[in-house]
């Protein structure tokens, strides 16, 4: 086997024909400035080629079902292994995905509970055992006389297939009726049953249909006996009767000769792993379908401005835009008459009874009124009033319009399911225990608590023999999660609430558990979101992978990871068009010795981010959060000084995001920005009057499509289009500003609709994107491109970098101010028209920061940033600090969640949470200046900070 991976002529994105040789079975770190080409080399070249070669080994039939990658722009790569990418972009937003399901621990738990779980009666809690046929018959006979019974044997339960053999066997055995997916059919009247083989089906044999009478007991007993024989111990009995109004009232019960409570007759099916899945209908709660929550419209989300009257917009557009002669408006008038109230008074002053019926309906109470149509026709009405909220919920369920669904969804909040109380499963499933805990109670434990649970778990010798392999797998997976610094996470934690770093480390733990050998792993900043204290554990886990015989390529900026690496590759020297070259490679000492390497300058100490000589005094005012209880926060009171750069620190899982993102941002934004999302649990926030707005500057993309770019996002494209519309050629032709937009008809190329590229479908090969043959990739039509400013057309301007555009637009302040702030935050290399899909998270965040800097400051803005150093090199952090200091110097307050010590040491004030993560966190460990926090021996942040301040 070859000892090296050899890359020749890599030209993907900004790479300038890079030739590189890296050792196999080692830990290799790719570093360099944000936008220098690290990810282009690691992910878009090495991983893409490895993936492409694997996919090419499959049949063309299999290839058409895979998300194929385009061939990277590289001459040659030799010595590649099968490649696995572990990046930060694949966080699962599915509300059904949890830490337990993603790591497959939950699959093993389901198997464990199905095999050694002890079932209990959900009513009385006693252990339950099987029912005899006599017991089942006694239970049936206890129902009201005269009820019609349908006694059935379950044959197929939610399995895919056509099931032709099963149906043929039923017909041969002389049965007349079956129930397929809830519908009764006669097998003797139908030759073929064309079931969709790709869908799951449920089939029951109808054993007998009989009226419940004492004299029919022996016939019922015979039917039950045959049903449990055919249904492998189970029978479904349908009880059919009529209510007082004569409406059909059906109820169905499942009985089993295997498990049932003798006192309450509660029976459960034979325990199978799928019973314990909240993603399958067999065990999931029927009300919330296993989500644990239901969507409800909150009163406060409907009544957005209670100080206004209903007709003036207290409920947004509900009623305020309604025709006075409309049906609902006349009903509203009658409701007001009934309550002797005036619709012109502010909503908050209306009687409570009226407000309640307005929102939730009149129930059975009917309104009597005279309705006059627009044509003058008069009708006498007598009916109930549905209520605004039930009406919206009904429309949400009935409408096919995405627009209406989206509008109503914005008013909805998650409410804990009233049936399962957030437990996701049926009560019969929750009554099965192992070690005294049901499966949901076990997943509510943190990883560390679960490890202790399995260490102390006592099982009988028989149960130990059955579960030995299952518990071994569970213990190993839990240990790997703890090893990568995720011991504080609960197994029930929703995957969508994890940070990019957390989800990446979960996948890393899963890979360690897989035990693969000879694989090329490519990781994207695994240290993100990890406190310095936990870095050693992560590096140990990474070293495990290489010791097993794997190659690790890690895109990373963390100093500890660089020192732990066997080989470092530094890409640069700059970013964008100024990067894409191999600056240095080798050991840490080799990088330090390279004078051209900016990374080497920081590692050697020749260049560093200085500690501020003084800390800002602030305004003397405070933003106070009282009684913060969200997630693991322990009813804490937090004081945030106004007019300072504030860092919220602490180990992973200590409660930083709960405090800042859930309570602080949503709490302040609900007042200043009219945000409708409900803030995290707390008593109150004081001092909001010190701010006119709050802005959350995260690393999410500035747009989801290639049409979004830095010029459109910052607002710079408007004055650029204005400028082109003022050119003599444009005026002569009558071109307006809209002519220079590639998003609307008129000036854009209609062949590609302003995209500049067209897609060629290749079926079992990846789709190929080629420049538009009409406009050549320019995005505009020929006539529009004839209008020029200083010799350049609009398409050529979008191809300019920020650095090139600065002198080009030097006399236009409305454009220059945007360019200058982009250059100030270190983005001089990006193109004005660079598609948002090609920007890294760090670049997107700095574009947002530049946009804020270009606005006129009020000095009363609260800025919130969650780990802004993600994806940033030492030199990029230097530029970030310049921006954060500028924002703070203008009188604004900046609150940053951060683990990076270079940022923390520059803060005016630190709030350190902990001391541990999960249940061991949620308290304030230390507050004050970096110097004050460094003196706190209980603070892990303080211990590391002390070294930085020397």
Which residues make up each language-model segment?
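Conserved phosphate-binding elements of NTP-dependent enzyme cores
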Residues: 1-950
């Amino acid at each position: 086997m070859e000892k090296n991976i050899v890359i020749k002529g890599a030209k993907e994105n900004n790479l300038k024909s890079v030739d590189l040789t890296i050792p196999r079975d080692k830990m290799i770190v790719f570093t360099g400035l944000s936008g220098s080409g690290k990810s282009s080399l690691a992910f878009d070249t090495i991983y893409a080629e490895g993936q492409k070669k694997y996919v090419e080994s499959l049949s063309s039939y299999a290839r058409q079902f895979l998300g194929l990658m385009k061939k990277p722009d590289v001459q040659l790569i030799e010595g590649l292994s099968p490649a696995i990418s572990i990046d930060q972009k694949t966080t699962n937003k599915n509300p059904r995905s949890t830490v337990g399901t993603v790591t497959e621990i939950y699959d093993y738990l389901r198997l464990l509970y199905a095999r050694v779980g002890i079932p209990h009666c959900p009513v009385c809690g006693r252990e339950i055992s099987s029912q005899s046929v006599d017991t089942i018959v006694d239970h049936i006979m206890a129902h009201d006389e005269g009820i019609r019974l349908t006694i059935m044997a379950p044959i197929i339960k939610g399995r895919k297939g056509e099931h032709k053999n099963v149906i043929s066997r039923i017909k041969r055995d002389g049965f007349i009726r079956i129930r397929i997916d809830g519908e009764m059919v006669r097998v003797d009247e139908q030759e073929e049953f064309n079931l969709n083989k790709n869908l799951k089906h449920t089939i029951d044999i109808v054993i007998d249909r009989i009226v419940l009478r004492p004299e029919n007991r022996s016939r019922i007993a015979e039917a039950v006996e045959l049903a449990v024989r055919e249904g492998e111990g189970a029978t479904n009995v349908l009880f059919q009767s009529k209510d007082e109004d004569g409406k059909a009232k059906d109820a169905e019960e499942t009985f089993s000769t295997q498990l049932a409570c003798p006192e309450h007759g509660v029976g459960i099916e034979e325990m199978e792993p799928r019973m314990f899945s909240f993603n399958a209908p067999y065990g999931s709660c029927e009300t919330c379908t296993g989500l644990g929550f239901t969507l409800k419209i909150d009163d406060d989300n409907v009544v957005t401005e209670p100080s206004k009257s209903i007709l003036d917009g207290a409920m947004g557009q509900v009623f305020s835009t309604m025709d006075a002669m409309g049906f609902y408006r006349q009903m509203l008038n009658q409701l007001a008459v009934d309550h002797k109230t005036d619709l012109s008074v502010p909503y908050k002053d209306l009687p409570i009874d009226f407000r309640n019926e307005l929102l939730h309906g009149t129930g059975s109470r009917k309104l009597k009124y005279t309705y006059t149509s627009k044509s003058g026709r008069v009708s006498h009405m007598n009916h109930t009033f549905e209520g605004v909220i039930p009406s919206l919920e009904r429309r949400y369920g009935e409408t096919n319009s995405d627009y209406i669904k989206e509008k109503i969804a914005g008013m909805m909040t998650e409410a804990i399911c009233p049936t399962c109380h957030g437990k996701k499963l049926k009560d019969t499933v929750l009554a099965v225990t192992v070690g005294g805990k049901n499966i949901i109670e076990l997943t509510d434990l943190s990883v560390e608590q679960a490890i202790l649970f399995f260490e102390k778990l006592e099982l009988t010798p028989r149960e130990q023999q059955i579960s030995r392999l299952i518990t071994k797998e569970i213990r190993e997976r839990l240990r790997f999660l703890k090893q990568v610094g995720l011991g504080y996470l609960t197994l029930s934690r929703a995957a969508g609430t994890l940070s990019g770093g957390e989800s990446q480390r979960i996948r890393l733990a899963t890979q360690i558990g897989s035990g693969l050998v000879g694989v090329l792993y490519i990781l994207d900043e695994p240290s993100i979101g990890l406190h310095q204290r936990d870095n050693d554990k992560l590096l140990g886990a990474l070293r495990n992978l290489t010791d097993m015989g794997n190659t690790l390529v890690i895109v990373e900026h963390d100093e500890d990871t660089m020192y732990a690496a066997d080989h470092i590759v530094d890409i640069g020297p700059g970013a964008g068009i100024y990067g894409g070259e191999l600056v240095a490679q080798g050991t840490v000492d080799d990088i330090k010795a390279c004078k051209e390497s900016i990374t080497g300058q920081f590692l050697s100490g020749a260049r560093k981010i200085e500690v501020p000589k003084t800390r800002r005094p602030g305004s003397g005012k405070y933003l106070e959060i009282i009684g913060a209880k969200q997630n693991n926060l322990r009813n804490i009171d937090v004081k945030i000084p106004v007019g300072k750069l504030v860092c919220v620190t602490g180990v992973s899982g200590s409660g930083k995001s709960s405090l800042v993102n859930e309570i602080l941002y949503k709490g302040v934004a609900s007042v200043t920005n009219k945000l409708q999302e409900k803030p995290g649990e707390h008593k109150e926030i004081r001092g909001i009057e010190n701010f006119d707005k709050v802005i959350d500057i995260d690393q999410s993309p500035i747009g989801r499509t290639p049409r979004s770019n830095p010029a459109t996002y910052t607002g710079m494209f408007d004055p650029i289009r204005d400028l082109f519309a003022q050119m003599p050629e444009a005026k002569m032709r009558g071109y307006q500003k809209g002519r220079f937009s590639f998003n609307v008809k008129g000036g854009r190329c209609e062949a590609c609709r302003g995209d500049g590229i067209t897609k060629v479908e290749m079926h079992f090969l990846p789709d190929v994107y080629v420049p538009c043959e009409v406009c050549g990739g320019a995005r505009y039509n020929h006539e529009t491109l004839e209008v020029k400013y200083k010799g350049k057309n609009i398409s050529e301007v979008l191809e300019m970098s920020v650095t090139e555009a600065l002198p080009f637009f030097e006399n236009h302040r409305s454009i220059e101010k945007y360019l200058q702030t982009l250059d100030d935050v270190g983005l001089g290399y990006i193109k004005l028209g660079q598609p948002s899909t090609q920007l890294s998270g760090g670049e997107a965040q700095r574009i947002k920061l530049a946009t804020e800097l270009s606005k006129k400051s009020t000095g009363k803005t609260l800025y919130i940033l969650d780990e802004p150093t993600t994806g940033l090199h030492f030199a990029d952090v230097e530029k970030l600090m310049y921006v954060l200091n500028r924002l703070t110097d203008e009188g604004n307050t900046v609150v940053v969640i951060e683990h990076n010590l270079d940022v923390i040491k520059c803060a005016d004030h630190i709030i350190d949470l902990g001391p541990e993560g999960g249940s061991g966190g949620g308290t304030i460990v230390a507050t004050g200046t970096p110097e004050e926090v460094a003196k706190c021996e209980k603070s892990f942040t303080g211990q590391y900070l002390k070294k930085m301040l020397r």
